[in-house]
Amino acid sequence: MAVPKKKSSKSKGRSRAAHHAIKAPNLTSCSNCQEPMMPHRVCPKCGWYDGREVVSMEE
């Protein structure tokens, strides 16, 4: 089994982990109500997806 020959410095480990940051989610606007929403999901405000009402929202 492989074992590290030398201790990794903090800067080496942190610079390697710099790519693991959580990215902000992409937001698009709903084509029906223009509210921000996640792409490829039903709009949480109006219930529309792909140009049609998928979930009826009671007001």
Swiss-Prot record:
UniProt keyword annotations, A-Z: Ribonucleoprotein, Ribosomal protein
Gene, per the UniProt record: rpmF
One MF annotation (Gene Ontology) recorded for this entry: structural constituent of ribosome
Highest taxon above the source species: Bacteria
Record's protein name: Large ribosomal subunit protein bL32
Entry's family note: Belongs to the bacterial ribosomal protein bL32 family.
GO BP annotations listed: translation
Organism: Magnetococcus marinus (strain ATCC BAA-1437 / JCM 17883 / MC-1)
Region (Disordered): 1-21
Cellular component GO terms held in the UniProt record: large ribosomal subunit
